[in-house]
Amino acid sequence: MAAAGWRDGSGQEKYRLVVVGGGGVGKSALTIQFIQSYFVTDYDPTIEDSYTKQCVIDDRAARLDILDTAGQEEFGAMREQYMRTGEGFLLVFSVTDRGSFEEIYKFQRQILRVKDRDEFPMILIGNKADLDHQRQVTQEEGQQLARQLKVTYMEASAKIRMNVDQAFHELVRVIRKFQEQECPPSPEPTRKEKDKKGCHCVIF
């Protein structure tokens, strides 16, 4: 079977996802909407929350451990600690906040530095897409940034549950593809090798 996130005792695939982005972009709202199908209206700055959800993605059962991180700068060191264990990252900005869009570069570079990699599983999410009248970042700008970062771009809305499940599921697909490239499955033995293994000589 193809490589996957590490498996628990039941053989189920398990993935560690980390949600990162600036303060107030809706990271917690996206996460809670995905986990509990509930929209959080009050903004309460997160220090760190973790959630677990069982899913079936492309006919493969998976357990997702999701870490919702602090956007505030004073929690930067704590965020790096979580980045070390993450297997995939949702880079979240608000389409109504130009500053949060410009911060994405910082988060992406921080992840790659912590991982000591040139690339790593991430997707870019433009949240609050329902607030089109307050938009400060166009869809084209989001797509352009995603091309520069070599990641998938989606616009989402935690409020109206737009592309919420799709965002988390797509990140799992990106992780699976990355892990399969890193650790490709062992090739099937050839007929000749099978015959060789099946041949036993008995000497009298």
Swiss-Prot record:
GTP binds at residues 21-29, 68-72, 127-130, 157-159. One of its GO terms (cellular component) is Golgi membrane. Gene3D superfamilies: P-loop containing nucleotide triphosphate hydrolases (3.40.50.300). A lipid is attached at residues 192, 194, 196-197 (N6-palmitoyl lysine). NCBIfam families: small_GTP (TIGR00231). A lipid is attached at residue 201 (S-farnesyl cysteine). This is Ras-related protein R-Ras2. Ubiquitously present in all tissues examined, with the highest levels in heart, placenta, and skeletal muscle. Moderate levels in lung and liver; low levels in brain, kidney, and pancreas. GTP-binding protein with GTPase activity, involved in the regulation of MAPK signaling pathway and thereby controlling multiple cellular processes. Regulates craniofacial development. It comes from the Eukaryota. The modification Phosphoserine is found at residue 186. Its main location: membrane. It is linked to Ovarian cancer: The term ovarian cancer defines malignancies originating from ovarian tissue. Although many histologic types of ovarian tumors have been described, epithelial ovarian carcinoma is the most common form. Ovarian cancers are often asymptomatic and the recognized signs and symptoms, even of late-stage disease, are vague. Consequently, most patients are diagnosed with advanced disease. Belongs to the small GTPase superfamily. Ras family. Its EC number is 3.6.5.2. One of its GO terms (biological process) is osteoblast differentiation. May be post-translationally modified by both palmitoylation and polyisoprenylation. The modification Cysteine methyl ester is found at residue 201. It holds the Pfam family Ras. Signal peptide: none annotated. A lipid is attached at residue 199 (S-palmitoyl cysteine). A motif (Effector region) lies at residues 43-51. It is found in: Cell membrane; Golgi apparatus membrane. Keywords: Acetylation, Cell membrane, Disease variant, Golgi apparatus, GTP-binding, Hydrolase, Lipoprotein, Membrane, Methylation, Nucleotide-binding, Palmitate, Phosphoprotein, Prenylation, Proto-oncogene. Interacts with RASSF5. It is a lipid-anchor.
